[in-house]
Curated annotation (Swiss-Prot):
Gene field: mrpl51
Keyword Nuclease appears in the UniProt entry: no
Entry similarity comment: Belongs to the mitochondrion-specific ribosomal protein mL51 family.
Molecular function per GO: structural constituent of ribosome
Any GO BP annotation: translation
Keyword NADP among record annotations: no
GO cellular component, one term: mitochondrial large ribosomal subunit
Transit peptide (first-last residue): 1-29
Species, as recorded: Xenopus tropicalis
UniProt xrefs under InterPro entries: Ribosomal_mL51
Oligomeric and partner information: Component of the mitochondrial ribosome large subunit (39S) which comprises a 16S rRNA and about 50 distinct proteins.
S-S pairs: none
The name this protein goes by in its record: Large ribosomal subunit protein mL51
Subcellular location: Mitochondrion
Amino acid sequence: MWSVQQLLWGCRSLLTQGCRSFSLGSRDLRKMNFMPQPKNTDRWDHKRALYGVYDNIGILGDFKAHPRDLIIGPSWLRGWKGNELQRCIRKRQMVGPRMFYEDRENLNKRIRFLYKRFNRYGKHR
């Protein structure tokens, strides 16, 4: 029994290489480096630099102001979400009478196009 184990132990590398009919790409898997190389990322890009910028509003302002009230942008878009058609309709309702003629016509054209598009294609039908 001991001699059989010694034979198998001594010829282990021959047995394992002899029974494989395909290559693993490397002779010894223990020598391979499995640690990935670290990514070179910019830690101060725009997204990371402004992360949590409005977190102190509640602490310093006694929780009276919501961050959406501090965001500067068009009045018809503040604190509101929606697709392009809904956004254009909302803009026409809020500032349509005060728009220049050409801008209002271009907005109406865009609304007509999007209305047809949303009713013909996509999951909105």
